[in-house]
């Protein structure tokens, strides 16, 4: 027996034993989990319905938008309903097929009824981005290229399903956006209108975070929970901060804890660490470290070795 066959055989036997010992490796009750690929496809294609002039190459979308929207929504309704039904059946073993189908249809109907409202809220988010970023040349640029808007778009869809307690799918959606943008918004967070994330990489918004209107976050901001060993005991407890209206939080600031409230019209400076409430109309900043600036002894050439010693 050659080395490859021997190694594969041993690995197969060991893996199979692990499958038998731990049920987590296999779906329960001979039922499927929702398809991550199918859920992501729905997210991608709904974007073409929300912003048809940007993410759909068919010229008919511009000439006959009503027919385009109806055609796409019919197809997407069925595909999302199928995944919701699968998720419900997996999470609730006692649920019968007929009951799951009826509940999935109810949830899906409510989701699609709210799409026009989501579209209007996203336009407000676009406006917030345009007002908040002098580098933005147009609103079209924001819609077509800004990662912050994409993460917010996915969150606003996922949040609708989260409120209906749909298992698995909301998190699949937002983790897709997380992987694409580096922005981690839990679908359970509550976020008001005119929300803008500038740059975005490293932003974290926890499940029980509440964010008001006209809030702007920069890269690396964490709206998180204080570390605890209680784990699942805190699953339904508010663990993340509340951010009131008209707040700006600069890069790499951390605002932590369920009892922490940042009041209206407040500015949180970069690299701050906040675990207690901040009153309205306040500026918070960390004391700057002392900079040491030395004049070099002579002009530096490209071949010089830098010496940071005295």
Predicted regions and their residues:
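Structural signal for interior beta-strand "rungs" in well-ordered beta-sheet cores
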Residues: 177-296
């Amino acid at each position: 027996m050659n080395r490859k066959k021997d190694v594969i055989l041993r690995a197969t036997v060991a893996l199979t034993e692990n499958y038998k010992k731990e049920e987590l490796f296999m779906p329960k009750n001979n039922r499927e989990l929702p398809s991550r690929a199918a859920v992501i496809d729905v997210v991608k294609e709904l974007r073409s319905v929300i912003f048809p002039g940007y993410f759909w190459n068919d010229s008919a979308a511009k000439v006959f938008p009503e027919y385009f929207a109806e055609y796409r929504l019919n197809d997407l309704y069925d595909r999302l309903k199928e995944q919701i039904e699968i998720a419900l059946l997996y999470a609730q073993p006692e649920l019968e097929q007929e009951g799951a189908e009826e509940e999935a249809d109810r949830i899906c109907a409510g989701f699609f009824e709210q799409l026009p409202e989501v579209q209007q809220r996203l336009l407000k988010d676009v406006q917030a981005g345009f007002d908040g970023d002098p580098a933005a040349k147009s609103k079209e640029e924001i819609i077509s290229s800004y990662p912050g808007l994409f993460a917010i778009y996915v969150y606003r869809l996922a949040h609708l399903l989260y409120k209906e307690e749909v298992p698995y799918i909301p998190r699949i959606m937002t983790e897709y956006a997380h992987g694409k943008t580096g922005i981690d918004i839990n679908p359970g967070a509550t976020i008001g209108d005119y929300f803008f994330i500038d740059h975005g990489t490293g932003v974290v918004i926890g499940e029980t975070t509440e964010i008001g209107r006209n809030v702007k976050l920069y890269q690396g901001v964490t709206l998180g929970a204080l570390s605890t060993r209680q784990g699942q005991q805190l699953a339904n407890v508010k663990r993340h901060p509340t951010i009131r209206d008209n707040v700006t939080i600069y890069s790499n600031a951390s605002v932590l804890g369920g009892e922490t409230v940042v009041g209206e019209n407040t500015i949180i400076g970069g690299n701050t660490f906040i675990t207690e409430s901040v009153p309205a109309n306040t500026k918070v900043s960390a004391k700057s470290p002392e900079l040491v600036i030395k004049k070099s002894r002579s002009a530096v050439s490209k071949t010089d070795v830098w010496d940071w010693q005295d």
